[in-house]
């Protein structure tokens, strides 16, 4: 079912895999693609205006409550940064693979506008982190302090995606690793293994190894619709102060 948003959504990367999922599940005012795309200038499903080839073509003055969703690639970050900075437009950064310089600029931008940093727009991943990983990591930390001198203890993440995915490891895997490391006081190295196949949408497994036994928890995306549906949480940006937010923040607010 299409979400009739009370905000004017601007979608960069409207014709990609993630962009298609967002379009399928949300009403989008302006969609942006590459200037070379043969669909530029044409009307496509769930897009209120013809597809544009640049953010410079967006009629920003016509929009009352614009929110920009980036579902493209890091190569577009500078133009997205400039657009959001100059127009004070809230940003949903759903693209992945950004370098340290870009992440630092994102942090600076968050002093001016609210930003939802969502390498994965799935509500399930947000639930997985907050309700499953978080308590598990807390208990792991306590256990680690007792047994680390007696047995080899380690954590590993395995991420599996389709072979058209550009970045490796996935942004979600990196986010999961950082999420865990930020909650463990002892120095721990978390290895990430990337697997590519013909059809996987996105599977992430976190393995806690205790020498002769291990505990595995995982999240598996079965449909791309979950990303488009998760993008609906962007409406909560309208009422937020400048800062960087996560899907977990908005998942709690939705409930």
Feature-to-residue mapping (PLM):
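Conserved strand-to-helix beginnings and helix N-cap segments that scaffold or border functional pockets
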Residues: 78, 103, 128-130, 169-173, ...
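Rossmann-fold NAD(P) dinucleotide-binding segment
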Residues: 58-94, 103-105
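Proline-centered loop/turn at the N-terminus of a beta-strand
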Residues: 8, 90-92, 114-116
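Rossmann-fold NAD(P)-binding glycine/threonine-rich loop
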Residues: 75, 82, 95-118, 123-126, ...
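Thr-Gly-centered strand-to-loop micro-motif
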Residues: 68, 93, 118, 193-195, ...
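Short glycine/proline-enriched coil/turn segments at helix->beta-strand junctions
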Residues: 24-29, 64, 87-89, 111-112
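C-terminal substrate-binding/catalytic lobe of Rossmann-fold NAD(P)-dependent oxidoreductases
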Residues: 2-59, 141-255
């Amino acid at each position: 079912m299409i979400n009739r948003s009370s905000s004017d959504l601007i979608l960069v990367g409207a014709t990609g895999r993630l962009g298609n999922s967002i379009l399928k599940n949300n009403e989008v005012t302006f969609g942006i693609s590459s200037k070379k795309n043969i669909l530029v200038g044409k009307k496509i499903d769930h897009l209120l205006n013809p597809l544009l080839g640049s953010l410079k073509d967006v009629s920003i003055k016509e929009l009352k409550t614009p929110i920009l969703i980036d579902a493209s690639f890091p190569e577009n970050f500078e133009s997205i940064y400039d657009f959001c900075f100059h127009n004070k437009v809230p940003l949903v950064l759903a693209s992945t693979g950004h370098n340290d310089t870009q992440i630092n600029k994102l942090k600076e931008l968050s002093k001016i506008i609210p930003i939802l940093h969502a390498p994965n727009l799935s509500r399930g991943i947000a639930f997985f982190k907050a309700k499953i990983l978080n308590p598990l990591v807390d208990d792991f930390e306590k256990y680690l302090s007792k047994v680390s001198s007696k047995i080899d203890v380690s954590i590993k993440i395995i991420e599996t995606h389709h072979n058209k995915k550009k970045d490796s490891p996935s942004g979600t895997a990196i986010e999961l690793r950082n999420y865990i490391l930020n909650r463990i006081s002892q120095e721990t190295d978390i290895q990430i293994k990337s697997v590519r196949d013909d059809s996987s949408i996105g599977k992430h497994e976190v393995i806690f190894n205790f020498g002769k036994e291990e505990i595995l928890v995982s999240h598996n995306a079965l449909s791309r619709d979950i990303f488009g549906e998760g993008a609906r949480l962007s409406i909560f940006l309208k009422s937020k102060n400048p800062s960087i937010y996560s899907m977990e923040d908005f998942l709690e607010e939705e409930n």
